[in-house]
Curated annotation (Swiss-Prot):
Pathway where this protein functions: Cell wall biogenesis; peptidoglycan biosynthesis
Main location (coarse class): cytoplasm
Gene Ontology process terms (BP): cell division; cell wall organization; peptidoglycan biosynthetic process; regulation of cell shape; UDP-N-acetylgalactosamine biosynthetic process
Keyword match Zinc-finger: no
Gene name of the encoded protein: murA2
Function: Cell wall formation. Adds enolpyruvyl to UDP-N-acetylglucosamine.
Enzyme Commission code: 2.5.1.7
GO function term, MF aspect, one: UDP-N-acetylglucosamine 1-carboxyvinyltransferase activity
Pfam families to which the protein is assigned, alphabetical: EPSP_synthase
Top-level taxonomic group: Bacteria
Subcellular location per the Swiss-Prot or TrEMBL entry: Cytoplasm
Family, per entry: Belongs to the EPSP synthase family. MurA subfamily.
UniProt name for this protein: UDP-N-acetylglucosamine 1-carboxyvinyltransferase 2
Entry annotation: catalytic residues: 116 (proton donor)
The species this protein was found in: Mesorhizobium japonicum (strain LMG 29417 / CECT 9101 / MAFF 303099) (Mesorhizobium loti (strain MAFF 303099))
Length: 418
């Protein structure tokens, strides 16, 4: 099992190429199952979650032709098989194949999902959306069993909260429904809008994605398509914090300011400078870090996927910061590991009080999930001495060559193979 060895104290400088968004790629790979025609996805990140999702569509008979940062998915011979727990236990996003399989074949059997251990994250809203479209749903022996032998029917779906996964599930299923579907209280994330753009390229007629109200025409006439995945705003935010925490300057190539307004606003409140460059965003810090409070919110609010990274940053700021997590329960699993490095953090329910300014020191730490693991990397970059981070397979799920990208910008980091 690989580990990372990091010696702190180096200022990061240079340029980082931001990869395609993992959280946009996964539903688009699943969406390929909707159509019998090939879908080519470009700007595809080279991360294990993407490889696992490609494996899931292969399981259902898709032929995948892979090249550097691209894949062509041909599902002309696809079938709806049972997606077993052994297949899906590695990541929660595999539940996204449920809607495409049901919509195209009229039946689907998908195991209840696994993934990061950061709370229950139930699929109730996914199931409710499919039921609203006319599907019959049952949970049997850990499987979601869905059927719609006479097809799906367009309807109005009101989500109880703006869930990204439920919005994507409803949107994909509605593309083949008879008549129009309206989704209200839809998630507004850029990844949702990018899925709609991909589906429209494939032949769907979707309007309003990126707002709280999405309209899907239904009865889609599919055709072959090509789609370029948006840059990863979470990866961009992570490297922005890396520049900030080390007092460096990084150019984030391909990063889009319009997807990162809440992140940029909070970084600027801590004394970090962010401005657009010719190829993306430039992030720089020359002044001492100031403490700032944070509340995670659905987009366009501050993303929960950057909460752990921002906590690492606040460990280095003068003063106290209060971080409130409102999206997922149990998403402070990184706190004990940050404290092993010397951080002063107190937890109370869904809040964390960070008293910054303490000197961090290298230690052996363990990654517990994807975003928690990268917060440990950020803290290690400014810790005195050597830090060893175990279980870095969590990092590889969502960050493409993170150690290489950091090393090219001046970090003292190496991957140790077991």
């Amino acid at each position: 099992m690989d580990r990372l060895r990091i010696v702190g104290g180096r200022r990061l400088e240079g340029a980082v190429t931001i990869s395609g968004a993992k959280n946009a790629a996964l539903p688009q790979i699943a969406a390929a199952l909707l159509s019998p025609y090939p879908l080519e996805l470009t700007n595809l990140p080279d991360v294990t979650d993407v490889e696992n999702m490609l494996g899931v569509v292969r399981l259902h008979g898709a032929e995948v032709t892979r090249s550097a940062h691209a894949a062509t998915i041909d599902t002309s011979a696809a079938v709806s098989k049972e997606t077993s727990y052994d297949t899906v236990r590695k990541m929660r996003a595999t539940v996204l194949v449920l809607a495409p399989l049901l919509a195209r074949f009229g039946h689907a059997r998908v195991s209840l999902p696994g993934g990061c251990a950061i709370g229950a994250r139930p699929v109730d809203m996914h199931v409710a959306a499919l039921a609203a479209l006319g599907a019959k749903i049952a949970i049997e022996n850990g499987l979601i069993v869905a059927s719609a032998p006479n097809g799906l029917t367009g309807t109005r779906i009101v989500l109880s909260s703006p869930s990204v996964g439920a919005t994507e599930t409803a949107m994909m299923a509605a593309t083949t429904a008879k008549g129009e579907t309206e989704i209200l209280n839809a998630a507004r994330e850029p990844e949702v809008a990018d899925l709609a753009a991909c589906l429209n390229a494939m032949g769907a007629r979707i309007e309003g994605a990126g707002t709280h109200r999405i309209l899907i025409a239904g009865d889609t006439g599919w055709h072959a398509a090509r789609h370029d995945i948006i840059p990863d705003r979470i990866e961009a935010g992570t490297y922005a914090i890396a520049a900030a925490i080390t007092g460096g300057q990084l150019e984030l190539t391909h990063a889009r300011l319009e997807h990162m307004a809440s992140v940029v606003q909070l970084l600027e409140a801590t004394g970090v400078s962010v401005w657009p460059g010719d190829r993306g965003l430039i992030v720089s810090r020359e002044r001492p870090l100031k403490a700032a409070d944070l509340t995670t919110e659905p987009y366009p609010g501050f993303p929960t996927d950057l909460q752990a990274q921002f906590m690492a940053l606040m460990c280095c700021a003068e003063g106290a910061s209060l971080l409130r997590e409102t999206i997922f329960e149990n998403r402070f699993m990184h706190v004990p590991e940050l404290m092993r490095l010397g951080a002063n953090i107190k937890l109370q329910g869904t809040m964390a009080l960070v008293r910054g300014g303490e000197k961090l020191h290298g230690a052996q730490v363990m990654a517990t999930d994807l975003r928690a693991s990268v917060s440990l990397v950020l803290a290690a970059l400014v810790s005195e001495g050597e830090t060893i981070i175990n279980r870095v397979y969590h990092l590889d799920r969502g960050y493409e060559q993170l150690d290489r990208k950091l090393r090219l910008c001046g970090a003292d980091i190496e991957r140790l193979s077991a």
